[in-house]
C-alpha cells in the first residue's frame, strides 16, 4: 500500500498542546513547537490495527513529520488535543490517518515513555479491521500487513518509533 504525502494542517508548529506531568495533570498549554523543542511531557494515543488473522498494520511515516520522519511505526496515533478524551483522540487519529470510522476500539492500557527525544503519557487501543484504508492526510507513505512472527525481523531491519514499540507491542493480544 503506497500513498502520496501532503501536509497535515493539525500538525502545525503553532498547534496548542497540553503539557502534563507524569500523573496526567495539565500544567499549561504550549505550542507543538515548544513541546518538541523542550521535550515537554504530553498526552498521546496509539492505535494498533490488526487483521482478523492477527497481522499488524505497520506503516512508514511521511518525511514531513516533526519527529522521527520516514521511520516505521507499529501503530497510528498522535498528540491528544487540549480537553480531548483518550477515546475521542483515538477515533480522530484513525479517521485522519487511515480513513476508518465507526470501528470498535479496545482499550489496552496507558503508560509513560521517555527518551532523549520525547516524553509522553499514552493510551493504547486496538482496532481489528481489514480496511479499506485511505491515507488522505499524508502522514503515512506506505503500509504493510506484518505477521506476528515477522515483527522481530522488521524491528531489526528498519528504524521504528521507540515509543510505540515500547508501549504498544507488549500490550497486543497473542
Question: Where is each model-derived feature located?
Answer:
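Acidic, metal-coordinating catalytic segment for phosphate/diphosphate chemistry
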Residues: 2-46, 52
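Nudix hydrolase/Nudix homology domain
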Residues: 2-3, 30-33, 70, 82, ...
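Extended, polar beta-sheet/loop recognition surfaces of beta-rich domains
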Residues: 15, 103, 120
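Short, well-ordered strand-loop elements centered on a beta-strand within folded domains, enriched
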Residues: 25-29, 54-60, 132-136
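A short, polar/proline- and glycine-enriched secondary-structure boundary/capping micro-motif
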Residues: 38-40, 67-71, 147
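A glycine-rich, hydrophobic loop/mini-helix early in the fold
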Residues: 44-76
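Beta-hairpin (beta-strand-turn-beta-strand) motif
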Residues: 52, 61-63, 77-79, 85, ...
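The catalytic Nudix box helix
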Residues: 57-58, 75-107, 125
Amino acid at each position: 500500500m503506497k500513498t502520496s504525502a501532503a501536509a497535515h494542517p493539525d500538525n502545525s508548529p503553532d498547534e496548542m498542546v497540553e503539557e502534563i506531568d507524569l500523573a496526567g495533570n495539565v500544567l499549561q498549554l504550549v505550542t507543538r513547537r515548544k513541546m518538541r523543542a523542550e521535550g515537554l511531557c504530553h498526552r498521546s494515543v496509539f492505535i494498533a490495527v490488526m487483521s482478523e488473522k492477527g497481522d499488524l498494520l505497520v506503516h512508514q511515516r511521511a518525511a514531513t513529520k516533526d519527529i522521527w520522519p520516514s521511520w516505521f511505526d507499529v501503530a497510528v496515533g498522535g498528540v491528544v488535543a487540549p480537553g480531548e478524551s483518550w477515546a475521542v483522540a483515538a477515533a480522530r487519529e484513525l479517521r485522519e490517518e487511515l480513513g476508518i470510522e465507526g470501528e470498535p476500539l479496545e482499550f489496552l492500557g496507558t503508560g509513560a515513555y521517555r527518551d532523549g527525544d520525547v516524553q509522553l503519557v499514552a493510551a493504547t487501543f486496538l482496532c481489528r479491521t481489514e480496511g479499506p484504508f485511505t491515507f488522505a492526510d499524508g502522514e503515512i507513505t506506505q503500509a504493510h500487513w506484518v505477521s506476528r512472527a515477522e515483527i522481530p525481523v522488521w524491528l531489526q531491519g528498519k528504524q521504528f518509533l521507540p515509543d510505540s514499540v515500547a508501549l504498544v507491542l507488549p500490550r497486543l493480544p497473542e
